Amino acid sequence: MTAIAPAIENLSLTVTEEIRVRSSLATTFAALLEEMGPSNEGHNGAPMPMTLEPWPGGRWFRDLGDNNGHLWGHVQAIKRPTLLEITGPLMMSFAVASNLQYRLKEVDSGTLITLRHTALGLFPDGYRDALAQGWPLLFDRVRRRVEQA
């Protein structure tokens, strides 16, 4: 039997997104932690609360109760209010390693949030496109939270 390995470009993923919000760095960073944690949402806006322990080595996970759940990653670096970096499989239940970086920067009109998600793994067909569509939804929730305050 002959097996053909996928090309390297089929094993990697890079998603970069930016959003500007009319809010301070500190308020925006707090909103990001809230929206990634207890106020997180899944498909179609369904509540999907997560726990994000905001310190180096802290876990980002979904607690399903009775010692069940999903580990999405660990906080690799946090520098309030300008950086949150997480490594782990995130929402993917297959052989993958991800690095997720949120960088926040003060700009004239408020705060610029830059997301960079890089991953290496055995992605099922269509998965890359689905991942790229999810991150803007989180950004929209952060924007609504800080601009309504």
Whereabouts are the PLM-identified features?
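Solvent-exposed alpha-helix faces
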Residues: 33-34, 140
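Short acidic N-proximal helix/loop "leader" segments that mark the beginning
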Residues: 1-14
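Short, well-ordered beta-strand elements
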Residues: 113-117
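Short beta-edge strand/loop motif at the mouth of beta-sheet-based domains
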Residues: 16, 23, 34-71, 81-83
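Hydrophobic-ligand binding "helix-grip"
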Residues: 50-52, 61, 65-108, 118-120, ...
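Structured surface interface patches that mediate subunit assembly and partner/cofactor docking
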Residues: 11, 41-47, 51, 136-138, ...
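A conserved amphipathic terminal alpha-helix motif
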Residues: 119-149
